[in-house]
Amino acid sequence: GCVGHRKSCEHDKKNGCCYFMTCNCWHPMGQ
């Protein structure tokens, strides 16, 4: 599921989990 906000999207972009305006990392394989 959604893990919460990130201060920087850069790391999450590399993992393909950065959303548009809010930096929410989504883990498809878990909650």
From Swiss-Prot:
The keyword Nucleotidyltransferase does not apply. One of its GO terms (cellular component) is extracellular region. It comes from the Eukaryota. Expressed by the venom gland. Disulfide bonds join 2-18, 9-23. One of its GO terms (molecular function) is toxin activity. Keywords: Calcium channel impairing toxin, Disulfide bond, Ion channel impairing toxin, Knottin, Neurotoxin, Secreted, Toxin, Voltage-gated calcium channel impairing toxin. It is found in: Secreted. Belongs to the neurotoxin 02 (plectoxin) family. 09 subfamily. Antagonist of L-type calcium channels (Cav1/CACNA1). The presence of a 'disulfide through disulfide knot' structurally defines this protein as a knottin. This is U6-ctenitoxin-Co1a.
